[in-house]
Amino acid sequence: MIGRLHGTVAERHPPALLLDVGGVGYELEAPMSTFYALPAGDQAVTLWTHLAVRDDGQALYGFASRAERDLFRVLIRISGVGPKLALALLSGMNAEGLQRCIEREDVATLTRLPGVGRKTAQRLIVELRDRLDGLLPAASGGVPARTGSGEQLDAPAGPQGSREDAVSALVALGYKPAEAGRLVNAVPGANDLPSEELIRRALQAAVR
């Protein structure tokens, strides 16, 4: 079982990334919360991992903290919530936001996330109500999400095609292509933003 990897990010195509560990490239899928925490350059990072065995092969998932990885594991144990939906949940809102939705039984906000219907939202509330305690404090050893000043690390410069990359990422997280395009196009200044910032703002708008 692979529990943690330390290396440099060679490629990033949300929600997928390639982590170079001693010359070996590991393909991982990660929630957008992890992408936001990654440094822009070639600084070494540590990702907590979960290995899933599927009928068509294996998939490795990476997370910025152990707490985030543990929350992912709690989510995929809920009936009807697979890894793809769990990634969408952790991409659409952070752990604290998810906890608030559960505590307030906020079905309306949960159903704005891709793949979450009313029944799934209600199941999440019932199943998670007593399971989130102790999961939210961030574990040490993962990639730093913020600088010492409290400001978010700079995102990598956005290449041409950031809009297309953002739409592709939202589709991979479960949004329909038309909805993904609408969310991205609605972001002010979309043409000037790097893809990960564009994804972040589109997801924020989706759950408002």
From Swiss-Prot:
Its main location: cytoplasm. Pfam families: HHH_5, RuvA_C, RuvA_N. Residues 144-157 are annotated as: Flexible linker. Residues 139-162 are annotated as: Disordered. One of its GO terms (biological process) is DNA recombination. One of its GO terms (molecular function) is four-way junction DNA binding. It is found in: Cytoplasm. InterPro entries: DNA_helicase_Holl-junc_RuvA_I, Hlx-hairpin-Hlx_DNA-bd_motif, NA-bd_OB-fold, RuvA, RuvA_2-like, RuvA_C, RuvA_C_sf. Signal peptide: none annotated. Residues 158-208 are annotated as: Domain III. Homotetramer. Forms an RuvA(8)-RuvB(12)-Holliday junction (HJ) complex. HJ DNA is sandwiched between 2 RuvA tetramers; dsDNA enters through RuvA and exits via RuvB. An RuvB hexamer assembles on each DNA strand where it exits the tetramer. Each RuvB hexamer is contacted by two RuvA subunits (via domain III) on 2 adjacent RuvB subunits; this complex drives branch migration. In the full resolvosome a probable DNA-RuvA(4)-RuvB(12)-RuvC(2) complex forms which resolves the HJ. The RuvA-RuvB-RuvC complex processes Holliday junction (HJ) DNA during genetic recombination and DNA repair, while the RuvA-RuvB complex plays an important role in the rescue of blocked DNA replication forks via replication fork reversal (RFR). RuvA specifically binds to HJ cruciform DNA, conferring on it an open structure. The RuvB hexamer acts as an ATP-dependent pump, pulling dsDNA into and through the RuvAB complex. HJ branch migration allows RuvC to scan DNA until it finds its consensus sequence, where it cleaves and resolves the cruciform DNA. This is Holliday junction branch migration complex subunit RuvA. It comes from Alkalilimnicola ehrlichii (strain ATCC BAA-1101 / DSM 17681 / MLHE-1).
